[in-house]
Amino acid sequence: MSAKAVSELSGKEVLYKYFEPSGLLSAPHAFHVKAGENFDEIANKYEWLARDNKGVIKPDQLIKRRGKLGLVKIGTPQELKAWFEKTGDSYVRVGQTEGRLHTFIVEPFCAHTEKDEMYIAIYSERFRDVIMFYEQGGVDIGDVEEKARTVSVPVQLNENAMTPSDEELTTLLGPLKDSDIVRRFVVELYKAYKDLHFTYLEINPFVLLNNQIHVLDLAARLDETANFLCADKWKSRLTPYGGPNHVEFPAPFGRDLTSEEQYISEMDAKTGASLKLTILNRKGRVWTMVAGGGASVVFTDTVCDLGGASELANYGEYSGDPSESQTYEYAKTLLSVMTEGTPRPDGKVLIIGGSIANFTNVAKTFGGIVRAFETFVSKLKEHKVTIFVRRGGPNYQEGLRRIKDAATKLELPIHVFGPETHMTAIVGAALGVKPMPTVPTAPQTTGQFLLSPERNTGGTERAPPSPAANATPTEHPLTTAQQNKLKSFRGLFEDDTKAIIWGQQAKAIQGMLDFDYVCRRSSPSVVASTYPFTGDNKQKYYFGQKEILIPAYKSMAKAFATHPDASIMVTFASMRSVFETVLEALEFPQIKVIAIIAEGVPENQTRKLLKIAHDRGVTLVGPATVGGIKPGCFKIGNTGGMMDNILASKLYRPGSVAYVSRSGGMSNELNNIISQNTNGVYEGIAIGGDRYPGSTYTDHVIRYQNDDRVKMIVLLGEVGGVEEYKIVDLLKQKKVTKPLVAWCIGTCADHITSEVQFGHAGASANALGETAACKNAALRASGALVPESFDDLGNKIRQTYDELVSQQIIVPQPEVPPPAVPMDYAWARELGLIRKPASFMTSICDERGEELNYAGVPITKVLESDMGIGGVLGLLWFQKRLPPHANKFIEICLMLTADHGPAVSGAHNTIVCARAGKDLISSLTSGLLTIGDRFGGALDGAARQFSEAFDQGWSANQFVSEMRKKGKHIMGIGHRVKSINNPDKRVEILKRFAMDKKEFAQETPLFEYALEVEKITTAKKPNLILNVDGAIAILFVDILRHSGMFTKQEAEETIEIGSLNGLFVLGRSIGFIGHYLDQSRLKQGLYRHPWDDISYIMPESNLVKF
C-alpha cells in the first residue's frame, strides 16, 4: 500500500519540523501515552503539563469524529490522568467496527472560541491537487464538501510552478482574504504537502491566535513509497523528552497488529517480495494462503460469495517471487495461528491458491510450504486440517509433485490441482458447497513445449476442438481481405514493433525473443538494451536456434539514435531511478509506449510522468505491472509467463478477445480462461496496481472499441477508485458498443468490518461507490455482461463468444501449430529434464541457497557456535567439526607462523616487489612462491618422517641412526639461531599447550616421541632442537590420529595432499600482507642491492672465445 494513514502525533510533528524555520506554526510538544503506562511518569517530563496547565487527551488510532463520540477530554493534568485511566483499554464501537482504545495523544489546550475555528484540507487526484478551505471549522462543520471553497492546482513537472495564484487564494479564503498569516499558512502548507509527499491532509480545526497558527486536529496520509526520498524529513523534532523519532503508521481502528502480523510486516519491509497477513478471526475455520495481489482478492471474494464470510480467518498474500525460506516463514507463521487453541470438532480448511505465475518459481515457494507442513504435521492432524491446493506457473508440475509427495509421506488430506482447474473451483469444494473439481488431462512436464491444448481453466465444458490445420496455413482470425482493410489502423503493438529494454534483464529479453520466434515474427522485437552503469557492448541471445547479438548501450540517447525504428521502451529501473529514466525517455519523439515494471514508485513522481506522457501522446503501462501481451506480435518482459503457458493459452497467434486488468497474475489467468472459452486473446494489458496507473481501463477499452480486429472486450476491475464508472458512462453514451464482459474483484470488502488493504495500492474503497459490488451493479445496469461471481466469469465469456460465433461476427479458423521453441538450458536443468557431467565438483562450500554453508553448516550456525577461525578452517579444509582444543591449536599455529621478520626469503621478496610499485596480490604471490622445502615447507616432510618411524616401531635412537645412515636430514629438527640454551619461544608455547591435558584433551604419542628424538639430537649439537615446523606438524598428526575425528585413511590422506604446509602458507600470508602494507605506508623507493654486497666472479678473458 502506498498511501498510509499516519498517527495524529506523527502528522503534527512532521509539519512542526517543516514549519520550524518560519515560526508560522505554534509547535507544542505533544506526546503519546499507551494503555497500561504510568501517566504521571510520562507527563512529568513535559514542563507545560507539570505547571498544571490545561491539556487535551484523545485516542490517536485513526478514529474519525472523536469529538462527537465523546472521545476528547480537556482538563487539568489530574483530570486527564483520571480520564485516561478510565478510558484506556476500554472498547468502543465506531460505525460497524468495535475496537480497543490503547494509544492516546496528549497536548496543550489552546483556549479559543468556536468562531476562531477554521477548516483546510488538501488531497491528490490523477492530474491535480485540490485545496479546500472554509472559515468555519470544528465538530459542527457539517457537509464540508458543500460549504468549502476549492482551488485546483494542476500537476506540473516543475513543483515550484505548482502553487495557487493570488487571485485563486483570494477566492479560496473568502472573508479571510486579507489575513496575511492565513494566506501564508495556506501557501506554506501546500508546499509542505508536496515536499513531504502527503496524499491527504485535513486540519479541522486550526485557529489563528497571537499571530500563530495552532493545529488542533489533524488527519493525514503519507505516500510510504517516498520513504527513500523523505526519511529524514519524516523524522520528528529533536526534543529533550525523547519519544519516537520516526513516522508511525498505526493499524486501522479495531485491528491491533498481532505479533504474527507484525512479524510478516517486518519481513515484507526487508524484501523485494510482497508479504501481507491480516488475521480477521483467530478461531475461524477457513484459512487462505494465496500467491498474487489480485488472486488473493479473488479467493477471498469467492469464500465470501459462497457463504463463508463468517468463517473466514485471514486475508493475505505472498507474491513477487519470495524465496523458499521466506515462504517457509510465512507459512509457518500462518500455521502457528491456525493450529493454536482447542481443535474444532468440524476441523479447518486451508486454501493454498494462486493465479498462474509469470516468473515466480512455483516449486521453490512450494518447497517452503512443504517444510512448514513437516514442522506442523502433528498440529495439522490434531486440528483436522484439510488442505486444498491450486497453482500454475513456472515449474508448477514439480511444485505440485512436492505437495503430493508431502501428503503421502505426512499422511495429510491434501487435494492438489494445477492450472487445468479453474482458479477458484477449489473454494466451493473446501467450503463443502460444491463438488470436488475433476482433474482434466494435462501435460505432465514443463518440458513439453508443444503442448496439446487440453487445459480447461474456464470453469466450463470444453469447447469443441478447432478443425485440424490444413497443409497451407490459414490467416487467423481475419481473412486477408479484412487484414488489408485494417492495415491503416495501428495499435500500440504490431508484428513489426521494436523495443529497447532499460536494465540488465537477460532473462526477460530472452523470453521476449522466444515469444517473437513462436509468433513467427520475421525479426526480433528487442533491438537494443541500455544501462548507464556498463559500457557499450554486445550481448548474445537466441532467436529460435540461431545465436544473435543485441547491442547494449551506456547512453539511452545513443540507443534511440542508433535505432530510430524503436517505438517502445520497457524499463526495469528500480523505484529509486525510474522517474529520471522515464523522464529522459520521454524526450525522444519516436517513443509511443513506455512500460514501467517497478513497484513502489512515489505517487507524485508517477503523476508528473503521467502529465508529460499525456501531453506528448505517449502511452504508459504501469508502474507496478508485469506489462501486456499481443499474441502474434509482441509481449512486454515476463508477461505470459513461461513458454509452456504461452503455448497452452495459444498466445502465439491472435484471437478476437481483448482484455484489460490491473493484476499481472490475474492477466495470466484471463489468458487461460479466454483461450479455453473463445478463439483466444487478441491483446491483454495489465495496467498495474498503483493508485495512478500510467494508462487506465478507459484508455484501453476505447482502443479496443476502435480496432475492428477486436470483437469482444473483457474488463477485470477491482475495489477502490472510480475508473470503472467511466466505462459505465461510455456504455451509456454508446461509445462502447462491442460486447463487454466485466467483473470487479474485491466484493469481500463488504463482508469485512475492519479496514483491510487488499493486494494493490489502489485496492481500497474510500466511499460507498468505490466498492466492487456497487461497480458491478452499475456496469450491469449500463449494459455490460456481468457474471454472478468470478467463478462464473468463464461461463459468461463462453456464452458471449458463442453468440458472436452464431452471428458470424467471429468465424473460428483452423489452428496452425506453432514452431518448436528450444528450451533454455538452465531452465531445463532446473526442471530435471537434462543432465550433463559437471565441470567442477566441490564438497566444502555451497552458496546457492538462502544462506552460505561451510561443509553443510549454515554460516549463522558457524557464528553462533563461536568456533573461531580454527573451526572454519576445520570445516573448509577437513569437512569436520573439530574439537575446541584443535580449533585453538590451529589459531595458535596461525599466530606463531604469521611472520618471522623481513630477512627471510618470502618477506624479502614481498618487500622488494612492493618497493617496485607492484600491487598487493603481485607482492604477496612473489613471497609465497619462495615457500618450499628450504623455506617453510618442512611441515609435510616432518609429519611424514616422524609418522613412518613411529609406525615402524623404531625407537627414537633407532630413528636418528637410520636417518644418519641414509644421509637424510630429519625434517622439523634444527634451527639456524635457536638452540637448547636459547630455546624458540614459539615451540615452548606449543609444548606447554600440548602438555596441558585439561585444555589439550587427547593423547599425543607422536609429539612425545618427537621430544625423545630432540633429546638425542640436542645431545649431539645444541641447535638440533625441535623447531616450530616440526612441532606444528607432529602435533597436527596427533590431532588427525587421536582426536577421534578422522579415520586412519583420512589422516594419511590429509598429510599426503599437503594440508600441513597449508597452515604455514595461510599464517605467513598474514605477515607478507603486513610487510606490503608497511612498505606502502613508508613510501620506500625501488630497491637496488648494493654492489659491495655482491661478489662479481667473472670468467678469465682468455677462456671466453668469440
Swiss-Prot record:
It is found in: Cytoplasm. ATP binds at residues 701-721, 752-778. PROSITE patterns: SUCCINYL_COA_LIG_1 (PS01216), SUCCINYL_COA_LIG_2 (PS00399), SUCCINYL_COA_LIG_3 (PS01217). GO terms for molecular function: ATP binding; ATP citrate synthase activity; metal ion binding. InterPro entries: ATP-citrate_synthase, Cit_synth/succinyl-CoA_lig_AS, Citrate-bd, Citrate_synth-like_lrg_a-sub, Citrate_synth-like_sm_a-sub, Citrate_synth_N, Citrate_synthase, Citrate_synthase_sf. The active site is at 760 (tele-phosphohistidine intermediate). Residues 442-459 have a biased composition (Polar residues). Pfam families: Citrate_bind (PF16114), Citrate_synt (PF00285), Citrate_synth_N (PF24948), CoA_binding (PF02629), Ligase_CoA (PF00549). Keywords: ATP-binding, Cytoplasm, Lipid biosynthesis, Lipid metabolism, Magnesium, Metal-binding, Nucleotide-binding, Phosphoprotein, Transferase. Signal peptide: none annotated. Mg(2+) binds at residue 718. The keyword Membrane does not apply. It comes from the Eukaryota. Its EC number is 2.3.3.8. It is an enzyme of class 2 (transferase). GO terms for biological process: acetyl-CoA biosynthetic process; citrate metabolic process; fatty acid biosynthetic process. Residues 442-478 are annotated as: Disordered. Homotetramer. Catalyzes the cleavage of citrate into oxaloacetate and acetyl-CoA, the latter serving as common substrate in multiple biochemical reactions in protein, carbohydrate and lipid metabolism. This is Probable ATP-citrate synthase.
